[in-house]
Amino acid sequence: MASKEFHIVVETGIHARPATLLVHTASKFTSEITLEYKGKSVNLKSIMGVMSLGVGQGADVTISAEGADADDAISTIAETMTKEGLAE
């Protein structure tokens, strides 16, 4: 299992466009990937799940992956979030 914490910096939080980007990135991997915020955990491959969390700017979230490609998944998602200016 691999996980990483992120601090959301994008002004609009994780709304439709960033959520779609994260779901698309997570869907490339076979591992189970979850997004946790305020004690709630959702499947990062589910757009509705991600949007339902209402993650705003300044939020701290944890993304976890479990499976054969967990380390690659977390690494790629972290790179995407940083490159797109979503989190640090």
Swiss-Prot record:
The keyword Transcription regulation applies. The modification Phosphoserine is found at S46. It comes from the Bacteria. Pfam families: PTS-HPr (PF00381). It is found in: Cytoplasm. Phosphorylation on Ser-46 inhibits the phosphoryl transfer from enzyme I to HPr. Residues 1-88 form the HPr domain. Keywords: Cytoplasm, Phosphoprotein, Phosphotransferase system, Sugar transport, Transcription, Transcription regulation, Transport. GO terms for biological process: phosphoenolpyruvate-dependent sugar phosphotransferase system. GO terms for cellular component: cytoplasm. Disulfide bonds: none annotated. The active site is at H15. General (non sugar-specific) component of the phosphoenolpyruvate-dependent sugar phosphotransferase system (sugar PTS). This major carbohydrate active-transport system catalyzes the phosphorylation of incoming sugar substrates concomitantly with their translocation across the cell membrane. The phosphoryl group from phosphoenolpyruvate (PEP) is transferred to the phosphoryl carrier protein HPr by enzyme I. Phospho-HPr then transfers it to the PTS EIIA domain. PANTHER family: PHOSPHOCARRIER PROTEIN HPR, PHOSPHOCARRIER PROTEIN NPR. Belongs to the HPr family. This is Phosphocarrier protein HPr. It comes from Lactococcus lactis subsp. lactis (strain IL1403). The gene is ptsH.
